[in-house]
Amino acid sequence: MEDAVTMDTAFEDKPLVVAGRTFTSRLIIGTGKYKTYAQNAQALEASGAEMITVAIRRVNLSNPDEPRLVDFISPDDYTFLPNTAGCFTGEDAVRTLRLAREAGGWNLVKLEVLSDPKHLYPDMAETLRAAELLIKDGFDVMVYCSDDPVYARKLEEIGCCAIMPLGAPIGSGLGIQNPVNIRLIIEQTKVPVIVDAGVGTASDATVAMELGCDGVLMNTAIAEAKDPIRMARAMRHAVIAGRESYLAGRMPKKRYADPSSPLSGLI
């Protein structure tokens, strides 16, 4: 029994902590592109996620005459993460999040300032400027950014509570396109690093976690799957598998074969 307890302890992992908030799930999902809020709620439950992004400019939170997200997903049960999807200037992003705080009292927010509607890459100069304003205003800022280690360091230095580099363009489903840069960001960063955007299927989520990311955020990969609920469940297992694999440490790659059964002592 003592050996079993020791083994269980060895397999334990530290929880994800963002701005003093603790999460057991390392998967974050969104609220866009689902057919209904009911489907979104089912996917959320299947995913095991505890945090869900909310596009303040697009999601109905308050109008009782139309379907409301809060009628299906309660902020008492999940951490709502207001984001600035659709904002193309720092001023617009700051204004949106200030309105979100007035409406729901949210201080933990996700900042994204986009550049071009075609590729939705972040405008890093505007992102940095907006992040500084929000942090001075008392927000805990999780920030969507490029996979540039230099900008990632600057965002951490000004006080962002999580760095969220893209794996590929938003909604592209291309998977992790620049694992080298993602790894560089992980190695230099003390706050959580969460891949945001580009995940297309479960194996992409596993790759992100095997690189050493603290979490993965996704929306389209689940919402546009043929079976969103099943894909949400797949993503749940993929994130866990990737994290376990990272903690276990993979075997070294070798140029030549190495037999599984020792050759010594053969009859």
Swiss-Prot record:
<keyword id="KW-0808">Transferase</keyword>
<comment type="similarity">
    <text>Belongs to the ThiG family.</text>
</comment>
<keyword id="KW-0963">Cytoplasm</keyword>
<protein>
    <recommendedName>
        <fullName>Thiazole synthase</fullName>
        <ecNumber>2.8.1.10</ecNumber>
    </recommendedName>
</protein>
<dbReference type="Pfam" id="PF05690">
    <property type="entry name" value="ThiG"/>
</dbReference>
<feature type="binding site">
    <location>
        <position position="171"/>
    </location>
    <ligand>
        <name>1-deoxy-D-xylulose 5-phosphate</name>
    </ligand>
</feature>
<feature type="binding site">
    <location>
        <begin position="219"/>
        <end position="220"/>
    </location>
    <ligand>
        <name>1-deoxy-D-xylulose 5-phosphate</name>
    </ligand>
</feature>
<dbReference type="GO" id="GO:0009229">
    <property type="term" value="P:thiamine diphosphate biosynthetic process"/>
</dbReference>
<feature type="binding site">
    <location>
        <begin position="197"/>
        <end position="198"/>
    </location>
    <ligand>
        <name>1-deoxy-D-xylulose 5-phosphate</name>
    </ligand>
</feature>
<feature type="active site" description="Schiff-base intermediate with DXP">
    <location>
        <position position="110"/>
    </location>
</feature>
<comment type="subunit">
    <text>Homotetramer. Forms heterodimers with either ThiH or ThiS.</text>
</comment>
<dbReference type="InterPro" id="IPR033983">
    <property type="entry name" value="Thiazole_synthase_ThiG"/>
</dbReference>
<keyword id="KW-0704">Schiff base</keyword>
<dbReference type="InterPro" id="IPR013785">
    <property type="entry name" value="Aldolase_TIM"/>
</dbReference>
<comment type="pathway">
    <text>Cofactor biosynthesis; thiamine diphosphate biosynthesis.</text>
</comment>
<dbReference type="GO" id="GO:1990107">
    <property type="term" value="F:thiazole synthase activity"/>
</dbReference>
<dbReference type="GO" id="GO:0005737">
    <property type="term" value="C:cytoplasm"/>
</dbReference>
<comment type="function">
    <text>Catalyzes the rearrangement of 1-deoxy-D-xylulose 5-phosphate (DXP) to produce the thiazole phosphate moiety of thiamine. Sulfur is provided by the thiocarboxylate moiety of the carrier protein ThiS. In vitro, sulfur can be provided by H(2)S.</text>
</comment>
<dbReference type="InterPro" id="IPR008867">
    <property type="entry name" value="ThiG"/>
</dbReference>
<keyword id="KW-0784">Thiamine biosynthesis</keyword>
